[in-house]
Amino acid sequence: MNLVLMGLPGAGKGTQAEKIVETYGIPHISTGDMFRAAIKEGTPLGLQAKEYMDRGDLVPDEVTIGIVRERLSKDDCQKGFLLDGFPRTVAQAEALENILAELNRSIDYVIHIQVDKDILMERLTGRRICKNCGATYHLVFNPPAKSGVCDKCGGELYQRADDNEETVANRLEVNIKQTQPLLEFYEKKGYLRHINGQQDIEKVFADIRELLGGLQ
């Protein structure tokens, strides 16, 4: 099974990726992991990517696509893969189609974990961290016993700057704009399947399992 996983920040993509990989025994391939592995192996493309990353620049598409091609050609991808964080653009999606055609493969499904923006805001702005011991809480899902105080050490809880409403709203807006053309591309291809990410974790995964039931 050849899968692409999509979802906005806070949609629970990471949790579902772990469950898919554990259940179906396919590799979880994220862009960051691919870059790190290529750099560690010292491949020509990995070294090129490192140069850009060391300068703080974006790695250009031709390098990223080359690394994806190398990764998908490895033995552990013969029975399938779960791509996460790639593609990010229609140009990358078209390049992925070409790579898979070279390998006589095709995408089975693009799984889009769908969550309303207001729920994503609640999930992403609710995090609180202890200034003293670093313990993490969530005002809705994992609140401290006493408001603003760490259960473990009594330290003060704070909200990280990038978890505030304005920053989170901007981050979501940027992601929505970037994601929309990609969703439309995969909708036209017939690969796209929406999964309701507003349910509890096990129900979300049950829906994914039902979708994947016919695939080997």
From Swiss-Prot:
Q: Which InterPro entries match?
A: Adenyl_kin_sub (IPR006259), Adenylat/UMP-CMP_kin (IPR000850), Adenylat_kinase_CS (IPR033690), Adenylate_kinase_lid-dom (IPR007862), P-loop_NTPase (IPR027417)
In this chain, the stretch annotated as LID covers 126-163
Q: Which residues are noted in the entry as ATP-binding?
A: G10, A11, G12, K13, G14, T15, R127, T136, Y137, Q199
Q: Could you name the Gene Ontology cellular component terms for this entry? A: cytoplasm
User: What is the top EC class of this enzyme, as a single word?
Assistant: transferase
UniProt subcellular location: Cytoplasm
Gene Ontology MF: a single term: zinc ion binding
Q: Where does Zn(2+) bind?
A: C130, C133, C150, C153
The keyword Membrane belongs to this UniProt entry's keyword annotation: no
Chain intervals for the UniProt region annotation (NMP): 30-59
Q: Which GO terms describe its biological process?
A: AMP salvage
Alphabetically sorted, this entry's keywords are: ATP-binding, Cytoplasm, Kinase, Metal-binding, Nucleotide biosynthesis, Nucleotide-binding, Transferase, Zinc
Major place of localization? Answer: cytoplasm
Q: One Pfam match, by short name?
A: ADK
EC number(s) from the headed UniProt entry:
2.7.4.3
Name the Gene3D superfamilies for this protein.
Answer: P-loop containing nucleotide triphosphate hydrolases (3.40.50.300)
- PANTHER family found in the cross-reference section: NUCLEOTIDE KINASE
Q: What does this protein do?
A: Catalyzes the reversible transfer of the terminal phosphate group between ATP and AMP. Plays an important role in cellular energy homeostasis and in adenine nucleotide metabolism.
Query: What is stated about domains?
Result: Consists of three domains, a large central CORE domain and two small peripheral domains, NMPbind and LID, which undergo movements during catalysis. The LID domain closes over the site of phosphoryl transfer upon ATP binding. Assembling and dissambling the active center during each catalytic cycle provides an effective means to prevent ATP hydrolysis. Some bacteria have evolved a zinc-coordinating structure that stabilizes the LID domain.
Q: How does it assemble?
A: Monomer.
What's the name of the protein? Adenylate kinase
Q: Which organism is it from?
A: Geobacillus sp. (strain WCH70)
